[in-house]
C-alpha cells in the first residue's frame, strides 16, 4: 500500500522561506494533486500560506516546496508560544500537524573594527543580515511578489553602555545584506563592556548583540604567550613547566625579566596564589621557562587532593630589559586531576538496533576542555580499540546481539606516555529501538568529520526483511531546515550504499534521516548526525600581491582579495596590539557557526526510541496516512548543556612572598666586615640576614670589631650629551629633513568592496579576485587584515587574518601614558631600537612644544648623543610638565651618525584636568496608571561641590519600556488539569448541559490563554467533537417554542433556557450553532418569563439544583434577572437582528437591577448584578467593592464555598469589563490559589464562571500590551520639550537624550498606559581629595648629596644618591619590587657600590641590570626581593659626573610591585630641590622657565642695545624701578614701576603703573635686581603672558634667558666717571629709538 507523507521542520519560522516535503511512497497509479496549507491555531480560521504541487513519475512522487508563513493573527509574545496547523490535502485524505512557530527572521552578525576603545574614539561597526538560509536578506530572495514587496528588511542598531543605556540608535537598510556605520564615543564615558544591539525591524523582540570594551589604555608593543607543558597537573606530578614567549608585535624577540606566580582558582571562582611559587625568570631572546613545584602548592594547601577539579593559573609580567614597558599575561584552566581526561558520549545515539552495528562516538577532552589528540580508547563489550583524531573524537563500531535488551558501553582511555596504566573511564547505557515487526534500519557514515566537497559514503543496512522491493526515502537537514530529499528502490539487498558530496548547504553539521514502510502500520526509520569541519560555505582569502617578509611604514602595498563571485567584502586592518589587550570580542567563523547551530531543531546525535522518535529527535514533524505521526514540539530550544569557555583576566594581587638564603658562618663573618654605604648600624644590617641565628651572630661579631676598606673601581663613560649645536653636524641628517611618523591608528582600511561576477567565458567559476592598492600607516607593528564576505550563494565567510609586519632597521618607540594631569611632572621614554648588525652612534632630539615644559623649551630642541650596540634597545628618558589641557604633541627625532638611517615620532599626549571621573545613577519608574493617569517626577541637578571647575560633564537620559504593562499581569490558571473536563455529554436536558459545559469552557479557556500544550495540542479536536455531540443531544430537549426542560414533557425552565443560551452563544465561535436555535430561546425568555418591571421569573425550577449556584438564595429576584440578562447580553451579537424586542427587554432588566442594587444584601446577587450592569456600561464599582473581603481579592458568600467562587468570578468579569485591571489582579491571584476538584471547581456554575472570568481577564490584559505611554522631558534652561511616545510597535526601542552639563534640573511628565524606566546617569570630574603624594603603595624619598672629593678618576664631581622606600601596608612587606632609577645625563653609576649591595648574605638588592656599561642605559633597574612595611629600606650608591652638559634635565626614580604597575615617582637634580623642572606660576597658571638665567648686562656697547631692541620677537623696552620683591625658595616676584616706555609692546598704557616680573630663585644672583634701583628691561613676546586674576586681564612678565636687564644709573651717578659712558650710551639709544625707530 502507498504511504502518504507530510514532513517539515518541527519549528517553522514566520516570514522566512521554509521547505515542506510531501510524498507518496510505493505509489502505484497516476499523478496526485496535493495542496499544502498553513492555518492559524487553534481555530484554523485564517490561511497563512498555501501552495499546490503535483506528485508524478517525473519527480518520483516526491516534492519539496517553499512556503512563506505570513504573520497574520500571530503575535510574537515572548511569554506565549504560538502554533500553526500544517496541512497537506491529498486527493483522498487530509494530513495535518500542529507545529510550533518561531519569529526568528534570520541572523544578524555584527563586526566592530576593534575589540577595545578609548573614550572619544570612533566605533566603526558593520552589520551582516541574513535569512535563516544564510542568504543576504533582500527582497529579491522571495518568490512571491506580494511577500517581497511587503518584506521589512531594515535593521535597527543601538549602542548601549554598561548600564544598558542606549546612547545611539539608527535604522539601516543593508545593501546586499551588509551595512557599515560609525559612532563616536563621548569624551566622558562609563568604562566596561559596551554592547552593539541589533534587531530586525520586523521582529524587534529578537536581539543580536556584539560586545566591545571601553577603557583608558595604551597599546603594548609586545605580546606574552604562555604554554604549559601539559594541560593538567596530575596529583602525583612533581612539577609543571610553562614556556614563556615574549615577542614584539613586529616579530622580534624581547629580552627582559618575567615575574611569575602560580595559584589556584577555587570552586567559588576565587583566586588564591601559591606564595612559594613567586619567581623571577630571565627572558632571553624572547624565551623563558617558569616552573611550578608540587611543594609550592603543598606549602599553602597541604592536602593537594582537596584541590582536585580546581584549576591552576599562571600569571606572568614581563619587563623589558631597559624597563621601558611591562606586559602581563595569564593562563588558566590547568586542572588538578586524578585522571587527565574527560569522556563524553557526544555523538553516540541513545538507542541501538538489536543485531545491527552500533557506532560509539566518544569525545575525549583534556581538563581545559580542549580536544585530546592521539589518545588510545578501548570500548567494551567488544574490547574494540580506537584512537582520537585532531578533533578529539574516536569512532568505534560495535556489533550487537539480536536479543539484547540494553547495551552497557564502557570506554577506557590509555595514555602511552604515562606510566600510570589506566587514566580515565566513562559509561553509558543504550536502549533498543522499539518496533512491532522486527524490521530495522541502520544508517552509517564512514567519516566523523568531513569538509566541503568530500563524498559522504552512507551505508543503509536494512538487515533481514520479508519485503524484497520497496521505496526507501532519505532526507538531509541542516540548520533546522530541510535541504535535500531523495529516494531509491531497494532490490532485495540488505546493504545499500549511497555516495553524496558534502555541499555548502550542509554546513556546519547535518542529519541524514532515512525510512521505509512495511505494510500499512509499520514505518522503519533511522538517522545520523554528521559534523563538518569548520569552514566557510564558499571561500575568502587575503594575500599580498607582492609578498615580502616585512614592509616599511608609509610604503605602497597591494592586496589581492579572492572569494565567492559577486560577494560583498568588508575589510579592516587592526594593530595586533589591540588583540593583545582584548581578543574576546572578534567575529570569527566559529562564533558564526556556534550561533547558527543553536538554532538547529535536531536535539540528539541520531536515532530514536522508535520510528517517530527518529523524526522528532532529528527536528522534523512527520505525518502519514497509515502510521502514527510525531509528537508535537512545545519548546523551541533543545535541552543542551552549556559549553564551558576559558576566560582570560589580568594578574591578581599577590599577598605574600618567601625568600631563603643558605651560607656558612665564615661567609657571614666576611660579609660583616664589608663597607656599607647606607650608614646603617650593625644591628640594622643584621636585620637583612635570613640565614639563621648562627649566621647573624657571626655577622654581628665581625661587623662590630672590624673596620672596612673602600674599594674604588673605574668605569668608562660612553654617554655623551650636548644641548648646544654639535661640531659634527654634517655627520647627521638635519632634524628639519626628518619627517616624523605621526599617524598611528589602531585600525584602518575600514572599507567595503565587491568581488566581480564570473566572466562570460567562465560563468561557473569558483572564485574571482579584486586588487586593492594602499599606503601603510606609520606604526611599527603587525597589521592583521580581516575580511568578511557575504554572498547570495555562499553565505557569510570570515577569512583567516592576513598579517603584514611593518618594521625599520632603526626606529624610535615613544612611550606616552594614556593621559597626563595638567601641571604634574612626569617622565616619558623614547625607546631606540637598533636591528642592524653594527654598533651605531645616534643623535636624539626632543623637539620643543610651547604648551609642554621640558629641557627643549625655548631652545627649539634638546639634544643627546648615545651609543648603541648591534641588535640592541636603548631607553632615553625625558622629564616634562604639560601646561595646558587638550592634546599636545611630543616629538622625538633621531638620526644615525654617518648613515642615512633616521626616524622621528610625533605622538599626542592627552592632558587632562586634575580630577577623578565620578558616575552617579538615578532611576525613576514611570507608571502613570498608578498615579491617577498622570505622573510628574522632578530630578534635581544637585551640582557636586567637588566638581573640577571648567571640566567636562554630561548627563545621559534614557527611557526603556518595561516588559510588562502598567498592570501586573497575573498568570492564567494552569491548563494542565483541564484535560479531565474534556468529556462526552450524556443524560437528560439538564445533565447534558452540565457535561457540555465542561469541554465548552475548557476550549474557550485554552483558546484564550493559548495553553493547549498543557493538556496536549491534539486534544482540541476531541473537545470540539464532544461539544458538537452535546449540542446535537440538547436539541432533543428543545421545545417548539425554543425553550428547554430536563425532558420535553416537563414544563420549560427559565434558568435552563437562559443557561442553554449562554453555553450555545459561547459555542457559536467553536462549532456551527444555528441562529434560530439560539434566538428563539431568547425570544421565549422575553415573551414568557419577563415581567413588566423588567424582572425575570422562574416557573419550573431545575431538578439538578446544584447546577444553578446561588441563584435561589436570598435576593434571588435580582440574581435570576441578572443571570438571564447576562445570557441575553452574550447572545445579543447573534440575535439583535432577528429579535427586535431584545434591546428593549435588556434595557428594562438593567433599569430594574439599577434600582434594586442599593438594597441587596447577598454578595452573590451583588456580584452577578454588577456584571450585568457592567455589560450595560452602568457599573457601580463602589457598591461592588463594599461586599469584597478586606484584601479586596474575593467575595465571600455565606452557605457555600462554590458560591464564593462564582460570586468572585462575576465580580472579576465586572471589573475586567470596565478595564479596572489594577483591582482585577489580586482576584486572579486568589482564584489561582483555590483548589480544583477533578479539573473543575466542584460545581457546574463555579467551574464555568471561574474559567470564563480568568479567560476574559487574560484576553483583555493581552491587549493591554498595546503600549500607549507619552513622556515629556523638560530640561531647565532648554526652550523645547523633548517628547516621546511609546506604543506597541516601538516599545522595544530605547529613547535617549543628553545634556552637556550636570547643573540642569529635569522634570519628567508621563501619561497614558504602560510602564517604563527613566535612567539618568551623571558623569563628571571631581577634585581629588587632598593628599601629600600620589604614591598610594610606597613612601619614596630621593636625596642627592655632593661629596667632598671625587672617587672616580674621570669624575668632575661625585655625589651620593640615597633612596629610602617604605611599603605602605599595615600587614605585610611588599613582594618582588622594581626600582627604576633614571640617570642624569653625563653621569655614571659606581658599579662597585651596586655589586656590594647585591652580593653576600645581606643582599639589599637582588639583582641590577648591568649586561652593558651602565651609562648606556636610560635607567638603572634594581630588583628588590622585598620592601619593608615597618622600617624604611635605604639604598645608597655613588654617581659621578664625567661630562659637562649645557642644560641638565632632572632624572626620575620610581618604585612599584611587579604586579601593580602604578608607580611612585620622585625626581632628583644636583641644583634643584625635588628635581622639578623650572616653572613660574601665578595662581594655577604656570609658565615654563626651563632655561639658563639672564645675566645683568654691564657696560654693553650701544650697538648691542639697538640690535636687541630691534631684534626679532622683542616686545617692549622699559625704564623701570624695583619697588618691592617677594623672594621664595622657587620663584622670585619683583614689583616694578614702569617709569618710561621706550618701545611700546603688547601691554598698552603701562607707563607710570606697577607690573610684576618673575624670575627663578636660583637666578637671583645672576639677575642682581635690588629694591629702589632702576633698570632698562627689554623682553621678548614669548616671555609676556596674559592671565586672568579676579576677573581682570593682566600681563605677567618673565625674566627669561632672553631678557635684557641693564642697570640704569641715577642722575647723580651719571655725573661720576664710572657711569658717564653708560648714561651717554643710554641717552643716545633712547634718542635713536624714539626719533628714528629701528633701522630697516
UniProtKB/Swiss-Prot annotation:
Q: Which purpose does this protein serve, as stated in its record?
A: Precursor of non-enzymatic components of the classical, alternative, lectin and GZMK complement pathways, which consist in a cascade of proteins that leads to phagocytosis and breakdown of pathogens and signaling that strengthens the adaptive immune system.
Q: Which PANTHER family match?
A: COMPLEMENT C3, MACROGLOBULIN / COMPLEMENT
Cross-link Isoglutamyl cysteine thioester (Cys-Gln), residue numbers?
A: 988-991
Q: Which GO terms describe its biological process?
A: complement activation, alternative pathway; complement activation, classical pathway; defense response to bacterium; inflammatory response
Task: List S-S links within the chain.
Answer: 536-797, 603-638, 668-695, 669-702, 682-703, 853-1488, 1079-1135, 1335-1464, 1481-1486, 1493-1563, 1510-1638, 1614-1623
Which Pfam families does its entry note? A2M (PF00207), A2M_BRD (PF07703), A2M_recep (PF07677), ANATO (PF01821), C3_CUB2 (PF21308), MG1 (PF17790), MG2 (PF01835), MG3 (PF17791)
Cellular compartments annotated = Secreted
Query: Which parts of this chain are annotated as the region Properdin-binding?
Result: 1420-1430
Q: How does it assemble?
A: In absence of complement activation, the C3 precursor is first processed by the removal of 4 Arg residues, forming two chains, beta and alpha, linked by a disulfide bond.
> Which stretches make up the Anaphylatoxin-like domain?
668-703
Q: Which residues form the NTR domain?
A: 1493-1638
**A cellular component annotation (GO) from this entry:** extracellular space
Q: Kindly report the protein's main subcellular placement as a broad class.
A: secreted
Q: What residues bear carbohydrate chains? A: 164
Q: Which UniProt keywords apply?
A: Cleavage on pair of basic residues, Complement alternate pathway, Complement pathway, Disulfide bond, Glycoprotein, Immunity, Inflammatory response, Innate immunity, Secreted, Thioester bond
Annotated positions for site Cleavage: 722-723, 931-932, 1278-1279, 1295-1296
Instruction: State the protein's name.
Output: Complement C3
Question: Which domain of life does the UniProt lineage start with?
Answer: Eukaryota
CDD domains found in the cross-reference section? ANATO, complement_C3_C4_C5, NTR_complement_C3
UniProt xrefs under InterPro entries: A-macroglobulin_rcpt-bd (IPR009048), A-macroglobulin_rcpt-bd_sf (IPR036595), A2M/Complement_sys (IPR050473), A2M_N_BRD (IPR011625), Alpha-macroglob_thiol-ester_cl (IPR047565), Alpha-macroglobulin_TED (IPR011626), Anaphylatoxin/fibulin (IPR000020), Anaphylatoxin_comp_syst (IPR018081)
Describe how it is modified after translation.
Answer: C3 precursor is first processed by the removal of 4 Arg residues, forming two chains, beta and alpha, linked by a disulfide bond. During activation of the complement systems, the alpha chain is cleaved into C3a and C3b by the C3 convertase: C3b stays linked to the beta chain, while C3a is released in the plasma. The alpha chain is cleaved by the serine protease complement C2b component of the C3 convertase to generate C3a and C3b following activation by the classical, lectin and GZMK complement systems.
Q: Which GO terms describe its molecular function?
A: (1->3)-beta-D-glucan binding; antigen binding; complement binding; endopeptidase inhibitor activity
Amino acid at each position: 500500500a502507498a504511504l502518504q507523507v507530510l514532513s517539515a521542520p518541527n519549528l517553522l519560522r514566520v516570514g522566512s522561506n521554509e521547505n515542506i516535503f510531501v510524498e507518496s511512497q510505493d505509489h502505484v497509479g497516476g499523478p496526485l494533486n496535493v495542496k499544502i496549507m498553513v492555518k492559524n491555531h487553534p481555530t484554523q480560521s485564517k490561511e497563512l500560506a498555501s501552495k499546490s504541487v503535483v506528485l508524478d513519475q517525473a519527480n518520483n512522487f516526491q516534492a519539496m516546496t517553499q512556503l512563506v508563513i505570513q504573520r497574520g493573527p500571530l503575535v510574537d509574545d515572548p511569554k506565549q508560544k504560538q502554533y500553526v496547523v500544517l496541512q497537506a490535502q491529498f486527493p483522498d485524505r487530509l494530513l495535518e500537524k500542529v507545529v510550533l512557530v518561531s519569529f526568528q527572521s534570520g541572523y544578524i552578525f555584527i563586526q566592530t573594527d576593534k575589540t577595545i576603545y578609548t573614550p572619544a574614539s570612533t566605533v566603526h561597526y558593520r552589520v551582516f543580515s541574513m535569512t535563516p538560509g544564510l542568504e543576504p536578506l533582500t527582497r529579491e530572495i522571495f518568490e512571491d511578489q506580494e511577500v517581497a514587496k511587503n518584506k521589512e528588511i531594515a535593521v535597527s542598531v543601538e549602542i548601549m553602555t554598561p548600564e544598558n543605556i542606549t546612547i545611539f540608535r539608527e535604522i539601516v537598510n543593508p545593501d546586499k545584506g551588509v551595512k557599515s556605520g560609525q559612532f563616536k564615543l563621548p569624551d566622558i564615558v562609563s568604562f566596561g563592556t559596551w554592547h552593539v544591539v541589533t534587531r530586525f525591524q520586523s521582529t524587534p523582540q529578537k536581539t543580536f548583540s556584539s560586545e566591545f570594551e571601553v577603557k583608558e589604555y595604551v597599546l603594548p608593543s609586545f605580546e606574552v604567550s604562555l604554554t604549559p607543558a601539559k594541560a593538567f597537573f596530575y596529583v602525583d606530578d612533581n612539577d609543571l613547566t610553562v614556556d614563556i614567549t615574549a615577542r614584539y608585535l613586529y616579530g622580534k624577540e624581547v629580552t627582559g625579566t618575567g615575574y611569575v606566580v602560580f595559584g589556584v582558582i577555587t570552586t567559588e571562582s576565587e583566586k588564591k596564589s601559591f606564595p612559594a611559587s613567586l619567581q623571577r625568570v630571565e627572558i632571553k631572546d624572547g624565551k623563558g621557562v617558569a616552573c611550578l613545584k608540587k611543594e609550592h602548592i603543598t606549602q599553602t594547601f597541604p592536602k593537594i587532593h582537596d584541590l582536585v577539579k580546581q584549576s591552576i593559573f599562571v600569571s606572568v609580567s614581563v619587563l623589558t630589559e631597559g624597563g621601558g614597558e611591562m606586559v602581563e599575561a595569564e593562563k588558566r584552566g590547568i586542572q588538578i586531576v586524578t585522571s587527565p581526561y574527560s569522556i563524553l558520549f557526544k555523538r553516540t545515539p541513545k538507542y541501538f538496533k538489536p543485531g545491527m552495528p552500533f557506532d560509539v562516538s566518544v569525545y575525549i577532552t583534556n581538563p581545559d576542555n580542549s580536544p585530546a589528540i592521539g589518545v588510545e580508547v578501548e570500548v567494551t563489550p567488544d574490547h574494540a580499540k580506537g584512537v582520537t583524531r585532531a578533533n578529539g573524537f574516536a569512532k568505534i563500531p560495535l556489533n550487537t546481539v539480536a536479543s539484547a535488551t540494553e547495551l552497557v558501553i564502557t570506554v577506557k582511555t590509555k595514555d602511552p606516555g604515562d606510566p600510570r596504566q589506566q587514566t580515565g573511564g566513562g559509561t553509558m547505557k543504550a536502549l533498543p529501538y522499539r518496533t512491532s515487526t522486527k524490521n530495522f534500519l541502520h544508517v552509517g557514515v564512514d567519516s566523523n568529520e568531513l569538509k566541503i566537497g568530500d563524498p559522504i559514503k552512507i551505508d543503509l543496512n536494512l538487515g533481514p526483511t520479508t519485503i524484497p522491493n520497496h521505496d526507501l526515502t532519505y532526507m538531509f537537514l541542516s540548520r533546522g531546515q530541510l535541504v535535500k530529499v531523495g529516494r531509491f528502490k531497494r532490490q532485495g539487498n540488505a546493504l545499500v550504499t549511497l555516495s553524496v558530496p558534502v555541499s555548502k548547504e550542509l554546513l556546519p553539521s547535518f542529519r541524514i534521516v532515512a525510512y521505509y514502510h512495511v505494510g500499512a502500520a509499520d514505518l522503519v526509520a533511522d538517522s545520523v548526525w554528521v559534523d563538518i569541519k569548520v569552514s566557510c560555505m564558499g571561500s575568502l582569502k587575503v594575500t599580498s600581491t607582492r609578498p615580502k617578509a616585512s614592509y616599511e611604514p608609509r610604503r605602497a602595498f597591494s592586496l589581492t582579495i579572492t572569494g565567492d563571485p559577486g560577494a560583498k567584502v568588508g575589510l579592516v586592518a587592526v594593530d595586533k596590539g589591540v588583540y593583545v589587550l582584548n581578543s574576546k570580542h572578534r567575529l570569527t567563523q566559529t562564533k558564526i557557526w556556534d550561533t547558527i547551530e543553536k538554532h538547529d531543531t535536531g536535539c540528539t546525535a541520531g536515532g530514536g526510541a522508535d520510528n517517530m522518535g527518529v523524526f522528532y529527535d532529528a527536528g522534523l514533524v512527520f505525518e502519514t496516512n497509515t502510521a502514527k505521526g510525531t509528537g508535537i514540539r512545545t519548546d523551541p530550544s533543545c535541552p543542551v548543556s552549556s559549553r564551558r569557555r576559558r576566560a582570560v583576566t589580568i594578574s591578581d594581587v599577590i599577598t605574600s612572598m618567601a625568600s631563603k638564603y643558605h651560607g656558612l658562618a665564615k661567609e657571614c663573618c666576611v660579609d660583616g666586615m664589608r663597607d656599607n654605604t647606607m650608614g646603617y648600624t650593625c644591628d640594622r644590617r643584621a636585620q637583612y640576614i635570613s640565614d639563621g641565628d648562627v649566621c647573624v651572630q657571626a655577622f654581628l661579631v665581625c661587623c662590630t670589631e672590624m673596620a672596612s676598606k673602600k674599594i674604588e673601581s673605574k668605569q668608562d663613560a660612553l654617554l655623551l650629551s650636548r644641548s648646544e649645536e654639535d661640531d659634527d653636524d654634517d655627520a647627521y641628517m638635519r632634524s628639519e629633513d626628518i619627517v616624523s611618523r605621526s599617524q598611528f591608528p589602531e585600525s584602518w582600511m575600514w572599507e567595503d568592496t565587491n568581488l566581480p561576477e564570473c566572466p562570460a567565458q567562465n560563468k561557473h567559476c569558483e572564485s574571482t579576485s579584486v586588487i586593492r592598492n594602499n599606503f601603510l600607516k606609520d606604526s611599527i607593528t603587525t597589521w592583521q587584515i580581516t575580511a568578511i564576505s557575504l554572498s547570495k550563494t555562499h553565505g557569510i565567510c570570515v577569512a583567516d587574518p592576513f598579517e603584514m609586519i611593518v618594521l625599520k632597521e632603526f626606529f624610535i618607540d615613544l612611550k606616552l601614558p594614556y593621559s597626563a594631569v595638567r601641571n604634574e611632572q612626569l617622565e616619558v621614554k623614547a625607546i631606540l631600537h637598533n636591528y642592524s648588525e653594527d654598533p651605531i652612534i645616534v643623535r636624539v632630539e626632543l623637539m620643543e612644544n610651547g604648551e609642554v615644559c621640558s629641557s627643549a623649551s625655548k631652545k627649539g630642541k634638546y639634544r643627546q648623543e648615545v651609543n648603541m650596540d648591534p641588535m640592541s634597545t636603548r631607553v632615553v628618558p625625558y622629564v616634562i610638565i604639560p601646561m595646558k589641557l587638550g592634546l599636545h604633541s611630543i616629538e622625538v627625532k633621531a638620526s644615525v651618525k654617518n648613515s642615512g638611517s633616521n626616524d622621528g615620532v610625533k605622538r599626542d599626549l592627552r592632558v587632562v584636568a586634575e580630577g577623578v571621573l565620578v558616575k552617579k545613577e538615578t532611576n525613576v519608574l514611570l507608571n502613570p496608571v498608578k498615579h491617577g493617569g498622570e505622573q510628574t517626577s522632578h530630578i534635581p541637578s544637585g551640582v557636586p561641590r567637588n566638581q573640577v571647575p571648567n571640566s567636562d560633564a554630561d548627563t545621559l537620559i534614557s527611557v526603556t519600556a518595561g516588559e510588562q504593562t502598567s498592570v501586573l499581569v497575573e498568570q492564567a490558571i494552569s491548563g494542565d488539569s483541564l484535560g479531565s473536563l474534556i468529556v462526552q455529554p450524556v443524560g437528560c436536558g439538564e445533565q447534558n448541559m452540565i457535561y457540555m459545559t465542561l469541554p465548552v469552557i475548557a476550549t474557550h479557556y485554552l483558546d484564550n490563554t493559548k495553553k493547549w500544550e498543557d493538556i496536549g495540542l491534539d486534544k482540541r479536536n476531541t473537545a470540539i467533537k464532544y461539544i458538537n455531540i452535546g449540542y446535537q443531544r440538547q436539541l432533543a430537549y428543545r421545545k417548539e417554542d425554543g425553550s428547554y426542560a430536563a425532558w420535553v414533557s416537563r414544563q420549560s425552565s427559565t434558568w435552563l433556557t437562559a443557561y442553554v443560551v449562554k453555553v450555545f452563544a459561547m459555542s457559536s465561535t467553536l462549532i456551527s450553532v444555528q441562529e434560530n436555535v439560539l434566538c428563539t430561546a431568547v425570544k421565549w425568555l422575553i415573551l414568557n418569563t419577563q415581567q413588566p418591571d423588567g424582572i425575570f421569573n422562574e416557573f419550573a425550577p431545575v431538578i439538578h439544583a446544584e447546577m444553578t449556584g446561588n441563584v435561589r438564595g436570598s435576593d434571588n429576584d435580582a440574581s435570576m434577572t441578572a443571570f438571564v440578562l447576562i445570557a441575553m447580553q452574550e447572545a445579543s451579537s447573534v440575535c439583535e437582528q432577528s429579535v427586535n424586542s431584545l434591546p428593549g427587554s435588556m434595557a428594562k432588566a438593567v433599569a430594574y437591577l439599577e434600582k434594586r442594587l442599593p438594597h441587596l444584601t447577598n454578595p452573590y446577587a451583588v456580584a452577578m448584578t454588577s456584571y450585568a450592569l457592567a455589560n450595560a456600561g452602568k457599573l457601580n464599582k463602589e457598591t461592588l467593592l463594599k461586599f469584597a473581603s478586606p484584601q479586596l481579592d474575593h467575595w465571600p458568600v455565606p452557605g457555600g464555598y462554590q458560591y464564593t467562587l462564582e460570586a468572585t468570578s462575576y465580580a472579576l468579569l465586572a471589573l475586567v469589563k470596565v478595564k479596572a485591571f489594577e483591582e482585577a489582579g489580586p482576584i486572579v491571584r486568589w482564584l489561582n490559589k483555590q483548589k480544583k476538584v477533578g479539573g473543575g471547581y466542584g460545581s457546574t456554575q463555579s467551574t464555568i464562571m471561574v474559567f470564563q472570568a480568568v479567560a476574559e481577564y487574560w484576553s483583555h490584559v493581552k491587549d493591554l500590551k498595546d503600549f500607549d505611554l507619552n513622556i515629556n522631558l523638560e530640561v531647565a534652561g532648554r526652550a523645547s520639550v523633548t517628547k516621546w511616545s511609546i506604543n506597541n510597535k516601538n516599545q522595544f526601542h530605547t529613547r535617549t537624550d543628553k545634556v552637556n552639563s550636570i547643573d540642569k534640573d529635569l522634570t519628567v511628565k508621563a501619561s497614558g498606559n504602560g510602564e517604563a524606566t527613566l535612567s539618568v546617569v551623571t558623569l563628571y570630574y571631581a577634585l581629588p581629595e587632598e593628599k601629600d603624594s600620589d604614591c598610594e603603595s610606597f613612601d619614596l624619598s630621593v636625596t642627592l648629596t655632593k661629596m667632598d672629593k671625587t672617587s672616580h678618576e674621570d669624575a668632575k664631581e661625585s655625589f651620593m644618591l640615597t633612596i629610602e622606600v617604605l611599603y605602605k601596608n599595615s600587614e605585610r612587606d611588599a613582594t618582588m619590587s622594581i626600582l627604576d632609577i633614571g640617570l642624569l645625563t653625563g653621569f655614571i653609576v659606581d658599579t662597585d657600590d651596586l655589586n656590594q649591595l647585591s652580593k653576600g648574605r645581606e643582599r639589599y638588592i637582588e639583582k641590577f641590570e648591568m649586561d652593558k656599561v651602565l651609562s648606556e642605559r636610560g635607567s638603572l633597574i634594581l630588583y628588590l626581593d622585598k620592601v619593608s612595611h615597618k622600617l624604611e629600606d635605604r639604598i645608597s650608591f655613588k654617581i659621578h659626573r664625567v661630562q659637562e652638559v649645557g642644560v641638565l634635565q632632572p632624572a626620575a626614580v620610581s618604585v612599584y610591585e611587579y604586579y601593580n604597575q602604578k608607580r611612585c615617582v620622585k625626581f632628583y637634580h644636583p641644583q634643584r630641590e625635588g628635581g622639578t623642572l623650572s616653572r613660574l606660576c601665578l595662581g594655577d597658571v604656570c609658565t615654563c622657565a626651563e632655561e639658563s638665567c639672564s645675566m645683568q648686562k654691564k657696560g654693553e656697547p650701544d650697538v648691542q642695545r639697538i640690535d636687541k631692541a630691534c631684534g626679532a620677537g622683542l616686545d617692549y623696552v622699559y625704564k623701570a624701578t624695583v619697588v618691592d620683591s617677594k623672594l621664595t625658595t622657587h620663584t622670585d616676584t619683583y614689583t616694578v614701576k614702569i617709569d618710561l616706555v621706550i618701545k611700546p609692546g603688547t601691554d598698552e598704557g603701562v607707563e607710570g603703573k606697577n607690573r610684576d616680573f618673575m624670575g627663578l630663585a636660583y637666578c637671583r644672583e645672576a639677575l642682581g635686581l635690588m629694591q629702589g634701583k632702576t633698570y632698562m628691561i627689554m623682553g621678548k613676546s614669548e616671555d609676556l603672558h596674559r592671565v586672568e586674576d579676579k576677573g581682570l586681564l593682566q600681563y605677567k612678565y618673565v625674566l627669561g634667558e632672553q631678557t635684557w636687564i641693564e642697570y640704569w644709573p641715577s642722575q647723580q651717578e651719571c655725573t661720576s666717571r664710572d657711569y658717564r659712558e653708560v648714561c651717554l650710551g643710554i641717552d643716545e639709544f633712547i634718542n635713536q629709538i624714539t626719533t628714528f625707530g629701528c633701522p630697516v
